[in-house]
Structure formats: C-alpha cells, structure tokens
Amino acid sequence: GELGEALENLSGKIFVELDYADLAGWRAWVDYPVHLPKGRGALRVWGDLDKGAGKVTADVALEELRIRLGRKLPELELASMRGRLEGDYKADHWAVAGQQVELLTQDGLRIAPTDFKVDWHQDAKTATVNGNSSASFLDLAALGRLASYLPLDTHSRELLLRHRPQGRISELRASWVLDGENLTRYSLKAGFQELGIEADHYFPGASGVSGN
C-alpha cells in the first residue's frame, strides 16, 4: 500500500537522532504539514503515534531552511533555527509548542529565544476554528516584518503592515474564533514595554508606552 496510508495507521513509540539530516530529501517519505523545499541540520525526535494521532517532540539545530506556512504565503528563508518543538495532533485538534526557539532569517532578522504555544480545534460540522496561544516574549517590529509569511487572517496582517508596531510584548495570552477567513471573536492579555504604533487616518498612534 501507500506509505502515507501506512503512516496514518502506525502506532507505537518513535525515537530518531541524527547529527545531519536533509529534511527536503525526506519529502518522498514524510508528509510535512508545511511546504519544506530546503533544510538541513541535526535533530532528535521522539514521541508516541496512535493511528493518525500522536504527540511528537523534536530538538532541532537546523540551517538553510526554506519553508512556506500556507498555500498562498511566500516562502520564508531562514539561515538557522534552534530550539525544542512539540506537536500534539488528532483529527480535529492540533497543538504546537516551542521552548527557547530562536530564528535568524537570511536577510538578518533575529528572533530571540522564545517559549510559545498555539492550539486550535476545528468543529467537524461548521469548520469553525477555536484557537488559543501564548508566548513568553514577542518583538513586535520583528513580528511585523514577518507578517506576510505567517498564517494570519487578512485583517490582522493588514493592521501589522499599516501601523508598524514597535516594542516588546511579554506573557502573551490570546484566544480567538475563526470562521473561514473571518475573525469573529478574540481576547488578548499581555504586558508591553516601549510600545509604539504609527498613526493612520483617525488613529492617533502612540510611542514609548508601557503597561499591561
């Protein structure tokens, strides 16, 4: 039978440790959840699989990555990526987390080591997505520069590009409901330092604001 079908029915524990791996070369055998035409480096992967569901953890030290996080998004080119990644998935629920994840893009943008978690559940009948996310630290200027590469809803991406936020966010907690491409409900809690937002039409903008 097809390898993909076999993997969907695979159950058991996995452990893989490689000093060097060509991730793009594995595409013939592994169905990555994102488009990954290039990438190499060291990794250690372990976890449990249960017939199309599972929990997997990976320690990675990768270089020269090209990755696309959505079908309509451009490829993000990374010089390096390091940290621990965790994935927990079922038919209607996904969770992705990272510990001390740091990135360096090919054009020199550096993302400092960050802990984060994103999980979402899709209703089988309505296809509505309920999501939650958290992050220990976010550099808003860096996030704005990466906005066009991230799987954000159209409104959020436009706001980032239009207002060009600056500053640092700490202890972020967010939740949302997504119906198709429409963000129908959200909540947000975070601390912020030296927050700045560019003015636009009736929005006055701000700079140097700190608080919660």
Language-model features: locations:
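Extended amphipathic, helix-rich lipid-handling scaffolds
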Residues: 1-105, 126-202
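Polar/acidic, low-complexity leader/linker segments enriched in S/T/G and N/D
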Residues: 112-116
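Short amphipathic alpha-helices and their capping/turn segments at secondary-structure boundaries
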Residues: 120-123
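Extended, hydrophobic alpha-helical segments in both membrane/secreted and soluble proteins
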Residues: 208-212
